[in-house]
Amino acid sequence: MSSLVKIHARPKLHEPNMLAAWPGIANVAMIAGSYLAHKLNPKPLAEVVAPYFFDPIGVLVRDNVVESPQFPESRFFYWKNTPGKKDLIIFIGDDQPSSKTYEMAHTVIDVAERFGVKRLYTCAAALTRIHHSEQPKVWGAATREPLLDDLKARGLVMGGDLQISGLNGLLLGVAKERQLDAICLLGEVPQYASRFPNPIAALSIAETMLNILDIEVDLAELKEQATEAAGRLKEMAAEAMGDYIDYFTEPIWERGESEEEEEDDSPGSPN
């Protein structure tokens, strides 16, 4: 195993799948991945040696005492399914490194191979013209054509040509280089809401992911988050529309007399 990874446990896993997630657009991947990790309560498996990939840019001071440099965590967990079903490894990266992303992806695949992972999954956002009041669909992308057949059968959208940015996408390409099957589930996010966390899209992804992995998880809390987010998006959209109307229109009682006279004297005005 690479010196870039610290192994904490060596469990015997049954044909495990792996789910990997980093922060990304609308934080969709992290919301979905972190929620499943929280609910499944998996056990620590390994962690990436952070100082190799991240450079601290400062320190915290508490009660006038300087603390040691803090690094984003990149951790692996394992969860054992019921006998006969496939186990699961979950990787959660608190942040994406500004460089060495290709090496980070290979490091994650190293762990996947070490524990016999059969298939890798990532999540991402699919920016579309969907309205915030619509139920987001889930798109699918895979490293091999045969993998797409199952996704199509489950009703996933085949988006054709697209780009998956960051490590949630790059990991798929590295998996293909290493001949490991990999799939990405992308939840639809309105283009105008890409900067806001979107548990609505994360919920759609989580429902699809659990179905594919044959795992049961209570999604009630995530559904509550999605409902709250839908309300906030509705409010933001209403405010934005109000600002738009205010900017491009002007109440007639705020016009000066000179403006009204100019309109009366304009060509084509009735006399």
Specify the residue positions occupied by each region the protein language model found:
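Internal, conserved structured core segments that host functional sites
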Residues: 86, 96-146
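Hydrophobic/aromatic beta-strand patches that form the interior of the parallel beta-sheet core
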Residues: 46, 89-91, 121, 181-186
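Short, structured loop/turn "capping" segments at alpha-beta junctions
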Residues: 118-119, 180-184, 215-219
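Fold-independent oxyanion-binding glycine-rich loops
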Residues: 21-24, 92-95, 123-126, 187-188
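Catalytic cores of processing enzymes, dominated by hydrolases/peptidases
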Residues: 129-212, 248
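N-terminal short beta-loop-beta anion/metal-coordinating cradle
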Residues: 1-93
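Conserved active-site and cofactor/substrate-binding residues in soluble primary-metabolism enzymes
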Residues: 24-31, 99, 103, 107, ...
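A conserved C-terminal secondary-structure "cap"
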Residues: 193-271
